[in-house]
Curated annotation (Swiss-Prot):
Main function: Catalyzes the conversion of glucosamine-6-phosphate to glucosamine-1-phosphate.
Residues recorded with modification Phosphoserine: 103
PTM per Swiss-Prot/TrEMBL: Activated by phosphorylation.
Keyword terms: Isomerase, Magnesium, Metal-binding, Phosphoprotein
Annotated source species: Marinobacter nauticus (strain ATCC 700491 / DSM 11845 / VT8) (Marinobacter aquaeolei)
Binding positions (Mg(2+)): 103, 242, 244, 246
Identification of the protein by name: Phosphoglucosamine mutase
GO BP of this protein: carbohydrate metabolic process; peptidoglycan biosynthetic process; UDP-N-acetylglucosamine biosynthetic process
Catalytic residues (positions): 103
Length: 447
């Protein structure tokens, strides 16, 4: 495959004002995408949605202009969760959906992500075609062929109804008090409606976006405010989304954090008990070994994908399985959505809790997270640690010392000059010793 110049594993992302996250580039990207979609024989319309970053207005206008110059009609959704844009792209029968967001990053970052007409990630060939057109100068189509732009005023309502449709009609949240943390992000105006309309008493924090406060000490990457609110309100559960709404983490009534690994186990184990799992479960290289061991105990197959929801989806599709996820709170539930969806994932977990007749704490007790420790070793330049004989030998010795109940992972960061050294096992002391020894070997082996 040709090396991509702009697209990473999850679109294009960077700091606002630094190439390629500039209005000039976004204008060109809109035009290039329009050319690629038209030549792929796709429908002549594209949806654009964004999160609540101030820079989103600027990039929305630039993309709109570029697409119109290519002769493509544009529908503007305004601030909407990333999975909502995937869903609406399908229901509007659009050529593609474009998301302007940098997910859980601070406001000074932004990015672009594309969805296909089916609401899935664009295939590699189409991304390569967009990059090919980015190398060409913009040529505006004939005046009578220019694209038109319009706003979709009922986008939030459409998505709220979709979220509710993913649970049975008889399911309600009556008698439940929830605290929602919307990260001052894209879920701020839809998530409260979903849970209130299903009968919950809802307290909301992180729902006053000002363009600069997205993810700032709130949301799934900063659970402190949610813990405090759950305690103060004596709520049953806290639910935290990230800035673009494709992740979810929870806080139990006792203030304990419920991460993506535990949510994945709760969902998978309850579906297995109901006979609705339909296969195994996909995690990632970073998924806690406790998940794998607990699922094995109840007869559920488990497979690890590379880190990233795109790779989780690839393995789910390859196996024709339904459920996968990451510790960060990205969960893919294929019989509900085409991509990770924080609100839908939260509803599915709450459905599992209600159906089980147990508390969240009782369901979590089915798995024990093993002690895990990671050290990031900074290197002059990234290299494959498994290509060094001294590192491989040290890793083999460490694995032998941990036995079957332990796991070691060495991998290069995809974005920074770091080698990540991670280990899991039964003993925290043993894990710490093993990771520190391996990190020292990696440091000495650095070129």
């Amino acid at each position: 495959m040709t090396q991509r110049k702009y697209f990473g594993t999850d679109g294009i992302r960077g700091r606002v004002g630094d190439s390629p996250i500039t209005p000039e580039f976004m204008l060109h990207l809109g035009w290039a995408a329009g050319q690629a979609f038209k030549r792929a024989g796709q429908r002549n319309s594209v949806l654009i949605g964004k999160d609540t970053r101030l820079s989103g207005y600027m990039f929305e206008s630039a993309l709109e202009a570029g697409l119109a110059a290519a002769g493509v009609d544009v529908k503007l959704l305004g601030p909407m969760p990333t999975p909502a844009i995937a869903y609406l792209t399908r229901t509007f029968r659009a050529s593609a959906g474009i998301v302007i967001s940098a997910s859980h990053n601070p406001h000074h970052d932004n990015g672009i992500k594309f969805f296909s007409s089916a609401g899935t990630k664009l295939d590699d060939a189409l991304e390569a075609e967009i990059e090919r057109w980015l190398d060409q100068p913009i040529e505006v189509c004939e005046p009578e062929e220019l694209g038109k732009a319009s706003r979709v005023d009922d986008a939030p309502g459409r998505y709220v109804e979709f979220c509710k449709s993913t649970v049975p009609n008889e399911f309600t949240l009556d008698g439940m008090h929830l605290v929602l943390d919307c990260a001052h992000g894209a879920t701020y105006h839809v998530a409260p409606k979903v849970f209130r309309e299903l009968g919950a008493k809802v307290t909301v924090i992180g729902a006053e976006p000002d363009g600069l406060n997205i993810n700032l000490n709130v949301g799934s990457t900063h659970l402190g405010a949610l813990k405090q609110a759950v305690a103060e309100k004596k709520a049953d559960l806290g639910i935290a989304f990230d800035g673009d709404g494709d992740r979810v983490l929870m806080v139990d009534r006792d203030g304990s954090e419920v991460d993506g690994d535990e949510l994945l186990y709760i969902l998978a184990s309850q579906r297995q008990a109901e006979g609705r799992l339909n296969g195994g479960v996909v995690g990632t290289l970073m998924t806690n070994l406790g998940v794998e061991l607990a699922l094995r105990e109840i007869g559920v197959e488990f497979e690890r994908a590379k880190v990233g929801d795109r790779y989780v989806m690839e393995r789910l599709l390859a196996n024709n399985w339904l459920i996968g996820g990451e510790g960060s709170g990205h969960m893919v539930i294929r019989d509900c959505t085409t991509t990770g969806d924080g609100i839908v994932s939260a509803l599915q977990v709450l459905l599992a809790v209600r159906k089980s007749g147990k508390t969240m704490g009782e369901l979590r007790a089915g798995m024990s997270k093993l002690p895990q420790k990671m050290i990031n070793v900074r290197v002059a330049e990234r290299f494959d640690p498994l290509g060094r004989a001294d590192i491989v030998e040290a890793m083999a010795r460490a694995e032998a010392s941990l036995g079957d109940a332990g796991r070691i992972l060495l991998r290069a960061s995809g974005t920074e000059p770091l080698i990540r050294v991670m280990a899991e096992g039964q003993s925290a002391d043993d894990i710490t010793r093993v990771v520190e020894e391996l990190a020292l070997v990696v440091e000495r082996s650095t070129p």
